[in-house]
Amino acid sequence: SFKDMTETLEKQIDAVASFAADVAHELKNPLTSMRSAIETLEYAETEENRKKLRTIIGDDVSRLDRLITDISDISRLDAEMSHAMMKQVNLTALLETMIDIYLTTQKDNLPNINLEIKKRRFKLRDGNVSPYFVRGLEGQLGQVVRNLIDNAISFSQKDGNIWIKMQRRNNMVEILVEDEGVGIPVDKLESIFDRFYSERPKGEAFGKHSGLGLNICKQVVDAHGGEIYAENIYDKSKNIVGARFVVLLPLADD
């Protein structure tokens, strides 16, 4: 009805206004810091102080760059999801390719990245085991996996392990991204998917994350008719020994 259309439009306008206000707030913080550092640089008396101020400016530029990139991604999501044609995506090949890229470009200070794909019982006509297929946008699904792996890396020690696992759960394909980090505060298991969620691990380089990565994951997964959530991993003594992100997507060949 016309009333429903009006209410929907009002909600969309409110959402855009809220997002714009959030963006303005997030952009203002590094800009204010950068302006202060630039103004102070002129009066710095020692090279050590000048170096500290240049570091602050560099960090703020990194933060702005990350923010602008992720804001651009978010602003494109709705348009891409509503107009793009969903195609059959081979998740098995997608994950294998992405992990190969990580391993090929892996730096010494990164944790070990492991891939474990549980084979399907369903076989193709040529006798080979079928990969996992979903209907969707390959680029967006790849971004979900990349964001989750990058998030796991940021919470991991360089000698730690990250596990990416894929298996069937009923009529869904389940992707798990697990790390051996400090875990997630129990009261933040849902809010970590909010826009501009800002809690980061101690010691992480400033500006590496915008607080939008997990929100992008949720938007993409929701648009694919799936589900994403986070949980902690516990040992036998009920101590948190890591975090697990779970993505569920409808299988395309069922």
Annotated model-derived regions:
Residues 1-15:
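Amphipathic coiled-coil signaling helices used for dimeric signal transmission
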Residues 152-153:
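Short helix-loop "hinge" at the ATP-lid/N-box region of the Bergerat-fold HATPase_c
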Residues 79-84, 125-136:
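Conserved micro-motifs of the catalytic ATP-binding
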